[in-house]
Swiss-Prot record:
One of its GO terms (molecular function) is protease binding. Its EC number is 4.1.1.84. Keywords: Acetylation, Cytoplasm, Lyase, Melanin biosynthesis, Phosphoprotein. It is found in: Cytoplasm. This is D-dopachrome decarboxylase.
Length: 118
């Protein structure tokens, strides 16, 4: 059950229409998870400073069970997410940062319980 959160200082007017759907599909492909299990949040218009600059930038937070826990996995994921984000948001790679958070099944609540018991 991947969670993807895109935070950017780009105004909402610069976020391409349908980005949430394309990011969901890309995440499912990149992490090899079913698309109907991916949760996407996009937060435009945030106040962000990166490398001492407020020029357009983005932070991507990727959390999931079992697929973001090693450097080898995340190197591959990173390359794919960077390709997607640079194309979709027209940002240079040095204006994007990705953070990966491995989750355990007991850390995600669903249907009145946690994923461990589903």
């Amino acid at each position: 059950m991947p969670f993807v959160e895109l935070e950017t200082n780009l105004p909402a007017s610069r976020i391409p229409a349908g980005l949430e759907n394309r990011l969901c599909a890309a995440t499912a492909t990149i992490l090899d998870k079913p698309e109907d299990r991916v949760s996407v949040t996009i937060r435009p218009g945030m106040t962000l400073l990166m490398n001492k600059s407020t020029e357009p930038c983005a932070h991507l937070l990727v959390s999931s069970i079992g697929v973001v826990g090693t450097a080898e996995q995340n190197r591959t994921h990173s390359a794919s997410f960077f390709k997607f984000l640079t194309e979709e948001l027209s940002l240079d790679q040095d204006r994007i940062v990705i953070r990966f958070f491995p989750l355990e099944a007991w850390q995600i609540g669903k249907k009145g319980t946690v994923m461990t018991f589903l």
